[in-house]
């Protein structure tokens, strides 16, 4: 769907970032035109002063709307649904909207910390474990978030064990079971019934990573939901590939180190 008189949308993102993938999916499902500027997390562009002026949290994504910065992927997607209401991606009923928000919060509170364990172990550990104490201290000084500072310290000095990663994947598997519960309750074909919503989008980046780590572990109703999702035009338009391949793409397509003004 085309949107007349849409504002200028600039998305700062990384191809393999789960939160960035959520926003790209929403932009794609809305049929919006946007400019993408890729941040190379491996080179810590998200911790640079110029990027922290856009997103003080020093994380991706950030969406500029006519130059106004929006942050936090769930909040960005709710803005997009309110600003561009067709097709709608939130239920009309306030109680059902609450359920979608509750699901999205569960994803952020539970599944994001879980997926960080395999993701960071794969990509960040090889970088961080080479740092001297002085290099680690310098990197940590540029990171606004205490949680992220703790993660980088963990990667550098006490990386996640195989058991911790397996427990994290168990959490993601439980998320897929919860999708099955919602599908059974709503009757499908989507998490909250016949309408594709932000709840489906919130889960998708975590399902794709779970499928990469534990292929073939989706229960039949969830696997059918997932195939329906993959068949949507928005999935192809969001350009979600393999985790490592998308990391390489972010490295190749990153903005200059000096940054680009939105």
What are the roles of these predicted feature ranges?
Residues 11, 21, 184, 192, ...:
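C-terminal or late-domain output modules
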Residues 31-33, 51, 144-155, 250-257:
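Short alpha-helical hairpin
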Residues 56, 105, 112, 120, ...:
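Generic surface-pattern signal
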Residues 87-92, 114-115, 189-194, 236-241:
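Short, hydrophobic secondary-structure boundary micro-motifs
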Residues 111-227:
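GST-like fold's C-terminal all-alpha helical module
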């Amino acid at each position: 769907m085309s949107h007349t008189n849409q504002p200028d949308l600039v998305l700062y993102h990384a191809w393999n970032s789960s939160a960035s993938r959520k926003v790209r999916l929403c932009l794609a499902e809305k049929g919006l035109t946007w400019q993408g500027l890729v941040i190379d997390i491996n080179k810590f562009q998200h911790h640079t002063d110029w990027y922290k002026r856009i997103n003080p949290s020093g994380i991706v994504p950030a969406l500029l709307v006519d130059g106004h910065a929006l942050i936090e992927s769930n909040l960005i997607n709710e803005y997009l649904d309110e600003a561009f209401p067709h097709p709608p991606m939130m239920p009309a009923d306030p109680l059902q909207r609450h359920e979608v928000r509750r699901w999205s919060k569960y994803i952020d509170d539970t599944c994001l910390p879980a997926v960080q364990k395999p993701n960071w172990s794969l990509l960040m550990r090889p970088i961080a474990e080479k740092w001297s104490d002085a290099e680690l201290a310098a990197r940590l000084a540029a990171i606004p978030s205490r949680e992220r500072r703790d993660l980088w310290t963990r990667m550098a000095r006490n990386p996640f064990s195989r058991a911790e990663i397996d427990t994290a994947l168990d959490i993601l598997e439980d998320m897929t079971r919860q999708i099955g519960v919602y599908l059974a309750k709503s009757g499908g074909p989507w998490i909250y019934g016949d309408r594709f919503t932000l709840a489906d989008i919130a889960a998708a980046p975590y399902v794709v990573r779970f499928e990469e780590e534990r292929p073939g572990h989706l229960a039949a109703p969830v696997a059918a939901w997932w195939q329906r999702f993959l068949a949507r035009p928005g999935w192809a338009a969001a350009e979600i590939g393999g985790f490592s391949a998308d990391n390489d793409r972010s490295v190749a397509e990153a903005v200059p180190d000096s940054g680009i003004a939105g």
